[in-house]
């Protein structure tokens, strides 16, 4: 239809503007997601597809429809080339998650931790496959670290020994980067904004941080209320924001006046 024809032409232009290590995120809903995926596969290449993100919607309205309620929209993530900028995204754990994931409390330091095996699957012929302190790794496994590193971990009190002499590594909560973000995004709903397609700053911050570095250029060719440009500015990125609608441009300009670079 006319929308697919329009987006097809624009996606080709966007592809040609991508940096060699750049990427693109295409946000759509259930009405066009299947066709948009096919269009993106054709334009960017099936082998450049990275992720399909399902994002919880702000106000699902499916109470009278036949079928399961639709409470998500879709973000397709493609890269320009085989390698693109990727900064692994992590989400901070809340107190309950920390206590669940790191169930042991060090009564001396007050730090929470969990323990993990010091061995990993697979046989190695080097030092990690040999005896350490008269201990061999379990059959079919090898030590995760060379002997010198194991000695250093033990010296620092980072190895916990069981009553049977089994060593395990202490992993502390305050040294954890957080929870690695997956492709189902909950609790990142759009703001209740006067602009109908306003996007959550949390969503844009997550995308921009993951796929760009400070000083990089971020572009949004359907800028709407200007969330992408506002977040890019706060994160120290350069940006381009365009839209066909005069109201969108007015809204974006007004919004960006008060944005402070981070």
Model regions: which residues?
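Core catalytic lobe of class I
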Residues: 1-261
